[in-house]
Structure formats: C-alpha cells, structure tokens
C-alpha cells in the first residue's frame, strides 16, 4: 500500500478461505467455446482461457460454502499450506481471493476487466512487491492476536506422518521504490512511502507455556 502524508496501519484482518476448492464446470466443445464460425481463429488465448476458468470458480465459490456445523472450516487460510515439499505455485484460493477483491474494488464485470487489464495497458504498480513461500523454520516466531509472541511449529502431525507449514508472504521489494517513495507520486508536493502491511492467518503454534494450538498470527501480506 502507498500512503501520502498520513499514518499507516500496521495490520488488517483478512477473511479466511473456503474449506474446499470450488468445482469447475466444463460446457460445450472446442467449436462452441470459440463461438460459431471461428474455426479459422484457432483456440482461444491462454489469458482468456484463464479468465474463463477463474470466472467459473468464482461463480461456484458463491454457491459452495463450508457447513456451519464444520468447526474446522476456520483452520483453512488462503496463504497457509500444509505440504511435504515447497509448493511450486501460489495457492489457488489466494489467486481467487485477490482476483475477486480486484473486481470488487473496481466494481466491474469480468468482461469489462478484460479490456482494462493493467498488464495489457502497460501500467505499473505504485509499489513493487515480491511474494514467496516461507517455512515455519524461517519464521520461527510470530505475533498472535493478543499481541503475544508465539513459536510457529515447523511440522504438523497428520494420520500418516507429518507435514510442513508453509506461508505465502508478500512484502515490498527492496529493489523497487520502497526507499524512494511511491511510483507516480509527485515528490515536490507529497511525502510517500511503500511499506509492508500484515494480516492474520491461522497457523499451528506454541505459546510460552508450551501450549500447542491453532492461533491467528500476523504475516506479511501486501505492500
């Protein structure tokens, strides 16, 4: 986030991800998907295909909701993953959440967005950021919602062994405009600064009394 001559918030609370990935519907064949008389145009572009898939998933997400009786639903987060190895891609729920937030903020439909994509217009973000998977071994400790420092457990026991906790963190890039101010802000009239902000996610931790449990902790989530 970029702030102009104003105090900055340290933390914001984000909503938690859905319990399961929404289903994906496939309709029609290649000819019907590309429209009538489009045989000479070939398959649709990868970008349009990706947007179509996300649109389907967002539609499904509005219908598929975790059961109110399922007490484990709040243990899932779009930025936390339990895995035996480092994930190769950003979490799907995170991509859906970020994409939906963008559409909601812009108050526009998917088709309108296709013609106003910043990447297609050559636009740059106000603050440069970097996202990567971080292990509990790298984090070691974190601050919970009560302000106490807790130990982030590296491994989570499961019926067939143990899985590692991974956190998908986003922070300001040291190679960007973090020290020089926000991109596009007139330095003659405004003082600006790119800062990493945090949100709460659910993770398995241990407090100073050796009590292990799932708690909300702060991690870097945006710039």
Swiss-Prot record:
Disulfide bonds join 127-194, 172-223. Residues 6-114 form a propeptide. Keywords: Cleavage on pair of basic residues, Disulfide bond, Glycoprotein, Growth factor, Secreted, Signal. InterPro entries: Brain-der_neurotrophic_factor, Cystine-knot_cytokine, Nerve_growth_factor-like, Nerve_growth_factor-rel, Nerve_growth_factor_CS. GO terms for molecular function: growth factor activity; nerve growth factor receptor binding. It comes from the Eukaryota. Glycans are attached at residue 107. GO terms for biological process: cell surface receptor protein tyrosine kinase signaling pathway; modulation of chemical synaptic transmission; negative regulation of neuron apoptotic process; nerve development; nerve growth factor signaling pathway; neuron projection morphogenesis. Residues 1-5 form the signal peptide. One of its GO terms (cellular component) is synaptic vesicle. SUPFAM superfamilies: Cystine-knot cytokines. It is found in: Secreted. Belongs to the NGF-beta family. Promotes the survival of neuronal populations that are all located either in the central nervous system or directly connected to it. This is Neurotrophic factor BDNF precursor form. It comes from Charina bottae.
């Amino acid at each position: 986030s970029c702030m102009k001559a104003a105090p900055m918030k340290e933390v914001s609370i984000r909503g938690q991800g859905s319990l399961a990935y929404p289903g994906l519907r496939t309709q029609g064949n290649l000819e019907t998907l590309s429209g009538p008389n489009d045989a000479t145009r070939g398959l649709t572009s990868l970008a349009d295909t990706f947007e179509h898939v996300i649109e389907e998933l967002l539609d499904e997400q509005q219908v598929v909701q975790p059961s109110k009786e399922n007490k484990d639903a709040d243990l899932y987060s779009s930025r936390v993953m339990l895995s035996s190895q480092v994930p190769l891609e950003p979490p799907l729920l995170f991509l859906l959440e970020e994409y939906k937030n963008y559409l909601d903020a812009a108050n526009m439909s998917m088709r309108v967005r296709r013609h106003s994509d910043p990447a297609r217009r050559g636009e740059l973000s106000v603050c440069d950021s970097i996202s990567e998977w971080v292990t509990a071994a790298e984090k070691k400790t974190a601050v919970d919602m009560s302000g106490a420092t807790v130990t982030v457990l590296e491994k989570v026991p499961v019926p067939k062994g143990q899985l590692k906790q991974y956190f998908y963190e986003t922070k300001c890039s040291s190679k960007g405009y973090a020290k020089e101010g926000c991109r596009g802000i007139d330095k003659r009239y405004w003082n600006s600064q790119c800062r990493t902000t945090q949100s709460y996610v659910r993770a398995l931790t241990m407090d100073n009394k050796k009590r292990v449990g799932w708690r909300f902790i702060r991690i870097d989530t945006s710039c």
